[in-house]
Swiss-Prot record:
Gene3D superfamilies associated with the record: 6.10.140.1610
Location of the protein in the cell: Nucleus; Cytoplasm; Cytoplasm, Cytoskeleton
Taxonomic lineage from the root: Eukaryota, Metazoa, Chordata, Craniata, Vertebrata
InterPro entries in alphabetical order: Lipogen_MT_Stabilize_sf, Spot_14
Gene: mid1ip1b
Designated name of the protein: Mid1-interacting protein 1-B
Amino acid sequence: MMQICDSYNQKNSLFNAMNRFIGAVNNMDQTVMVPSLLRDVPLDQEEEKEVTSFQDGDMYGSYVLLKSIRNDIEWGVLQAEERRKEKHGVTTTSLEVSRIEPNDKDLEKLFHYHLSGLHTVLAKLTRKANTLTNRYKQEIGIGGCGN
């Protein structure tokens, strides 16, 4: 019984959610051989109905966004931000981030709130990567477009 419970909990772990997302994006990246074909291809009607903050209008924008998020997860947000600054000619010696420090009592509550949100976002991003992969296969006429 303990093994079943542990297996269920592991399936819902943050680590596994990130691995599912990274795997979906890697699959998308390996499938999409010509990303420029995604330009001006509208999102699914189902996708258009869904209100999200990362809609980019076409599949190419989603492709770029998903790869960017994968890189942020794999390499860290700070490294990605430093690469962007170097690319634009801005260099900084220290990261200046203004933060409001929460009370120690609020840390656990804050952690659970953000963890839950992260699980939700990762699940949506994983679905988006899988949908994009399948839509690309349809667009180029690959048979058997299932997962």
